[in-house]
Amino acid sequence: NDAVQAEIDAAKAAMLTKPSKFVVFLVMFYAFLCMAIMYGAQQYTKAFGLSVCGLSEMQAAGMTSIYTIGSICAVLFWAFMMAKLKWSPLKVVLIDSVCTAVALAGVLFIHQVAIIYIAIAMLGFFAAGGALQTGLAVVQLFNPGPKGRNTGIYYTFMGAASYLIPVVAAQLTKASGEANAVYSLMIMLLVFAILAILSSLYLVAQHKKIFGKGAL
């Protein structure tokens, strides 16, 4: 316990100024944004491929496999980048958010099988491949405290997303039919990805203020 407390104290001592409540909220809210994108991409890309992009059942099923392969590759890749190149978790979160938005835009606006497959692999890589765990490292950076407490709050935001997305999807389907619903849902995920980019950029600016050095 003393060692844990010493680590927390050292992390707090490294700060030139205390992070605002808004900064602490943002690092936690990333869990909601990331989980919403991840859950939505996992559950609804196949339906999107079938009903919006006109893919065959076989092609749409392939999207799920490509997404999974992308996410497995990413876990290994980011672990290497952060361990070997000492990349800041905030830098990884920013890259993840930008590439997730690009991938979602690709899925939404370019209805060609090859482009959709590339975009889905990118989604798996950048949205699912360890982005949540990296976000938790950002929480510890800006809000040093007992890991159990921070993880608990972070998981609560994740839980809210995995509860909300199916509820929203069900309401949209009821209101406008499946094809319109999955399209609206993908637009919503793109908005979430853009919010994640804006949050990350704000945190990059705050990092300079709080720690006296750039995060990138």
Give names to the regions the model predicted.
Residues 115-130:
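Hydrophobic core of transmembrane alpha-helices in multi-pass small-molecule transporters
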Residues 91-105:
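Structural signature of the two symmetry-related core transmembrane helices
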Residues 49-50, 81-82, 168-179:
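Interfacial helix-cap and linker-helix signal at transmembrane-aqueous boundaries
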Residues 129-143:
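Intracellular juxtamembrane helix-capping segments at the cytosolic ends
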Residues 19-75:
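Extracytoplasmic gate region of multi-pass secondary transporters
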Residues 184-204:
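Symmetry-related core transmembrane helices of the 12-TM Major Facilitator Superfamily/SLC fold
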Residues 141-176:
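A late C-terminal transmembrane helix in Major Facilitator Superfamily
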Residues 74-88, 173:
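Helix-to-loop junctions at the C-terminal end of transmembrane segments
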